[in-house]
Amino acid sequence: MSVIPMVVEQTSRGERSYDIYSRLLKERVIFLSGEVEDRMANLIVAQLLFLESEDPTKDINIYINSPGGSVTAGMAIYDTMQFIKPDIRTLCIGQACSMGAFLLAGGTAGKRAALPNARVMIHQPLGGFRGQASDIQIHAQEILKIKHTLNDRLAFHTGQSIERIEKDTDRDNFMSAEEAQAYGLVDEVLVKR
């Protein structure tokens, strides 16, 4: 079990304590860490909508350290990132794999970055299903539709051809921060502020 640090802030009304993530949210920083799943996606969507309502003209920063996860949960975050008015700055800290890499690339063009030792990995969606042959066929068709959608969006955000994306996501494709920049997943590698 991890302990979340508390931050004490002095105000004209006295002291106020926040958990570190709430304090950073005041600075328009959202942490996307761990597996992308429904509960996490709902929290991130809520934070995005809250920050938009606070000031639709100021950028929102999403720090990503994720091994990936659920496509539908990730698409809820992605669609909200594209829907709201503020620009979204994405920054890979540690790793952005699978859906994490997709969300990293989905930031506002020119505002996507990675730290020097970050790792990025893209691949095709994973799926598994058991049951009747007709149900397996339905799920296989759905995974192919999802694969096409993800590849289309990656091509849009990276500037790579759909053919290149299909080839490069056929198997796990790991990249350094510099390689992710050359590929178009991020716009810069940040060394210092």
Curated annotation (Swiss-Prot):
Keywords: Cytoplasm, Hydrolase, Protease, Serine protease
InterPro entries in the cross-refs: ClpP, ClpP/crotonase-like_dom_sf, ClpP/TepA, ClpP_His_AS, ClpP_Ser_AS
EC number: 3.4.21.92
Enzyme class per UniProt: hydrolase
GO terms, molecular function: ATP-dependent peptidase activity; ATPase binding; serine-type endopeptidase activity
GO cellular component: cytoplasm; endopeptidase Clp complex
Assembly information from the UniProt record: Fourteen ClpP subunits assemble into 2 heptameric rings which stack back to back to give a disk-like structure with a central cavity, resembling the structure of eukaryotic proteasomes.
UniProt-recorded name of the protein: ATP-dependent Clp protease proteolytic subunit
